[in-house]
Amino acid sequence: LRCDNSMSFCQPFKIDIPDATLNSVIERVAAYPWHEMPNDGGWDYGSNLDYMKELAQYWVNEYDWRKHESAINIFSQFRAQVDGIDIHFIHEVGSGPSPTPLIISHGWPGTVVEFMKVIEPLAHPERFGGKVEDAFTVIAPSLPGFGFSGAPPRPYGPRKIAGILNALMTEVLGYDSYIAQGGDWGGTISAWLGFDHSKSVSYTHLTLPTTAI
């Protein structure tokens, strides 16, 4: 991995949301004007109002962001500037002498949190009864404009984003060959990775494939 504190374009990253930001979110949710919302008692015209009130109360009174923040920060994270955009990504180096690089891309609306339960088994299969030779080095990026990645200067389509992710894998991280996996928009992006960057992408795995490119 070629990212460290001495490099301006790629540095270690940890999530640390200020208390003031968290409090602001809680205050806004708590103060939401529910009386202004139409209520037909069902789901025909959107989310059920009673359900949304219950969800908001859970968010205000029970949800513990710090717990989830700590769970994400267990993994090594970085931010790298690619094509002028700061790309946030998890980089979990796999076990053994030669783990296969694997980039996994989320969809919309989604984040890298989708992958929290699979990163460790993929990177360290021996901890779960598997074989160390089946390990992957897992790279889970936040797509541009999502999570802790910066927003692009204009709308970017999946093909453009695929080029950014390939640059992350080959130019920033230095991998000659890797596997691409994705679902939803991540599946479309992964398909473009395989189509446009076949010299680097050895395989693609799509959990929600597109019918045509």
Give the predicted meaning of each segment.
Residues 162-178:
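Conserved acidic catalytic loop of the alpha/beta-hydrolase fold
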Residues 182, 186:
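Gly/Ala-rich beta-loop-alpha elbow adjacent to hydrolase catalytic centers
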Residues 187-196:
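Short glycine-enriched nucleophile-adjacent loop
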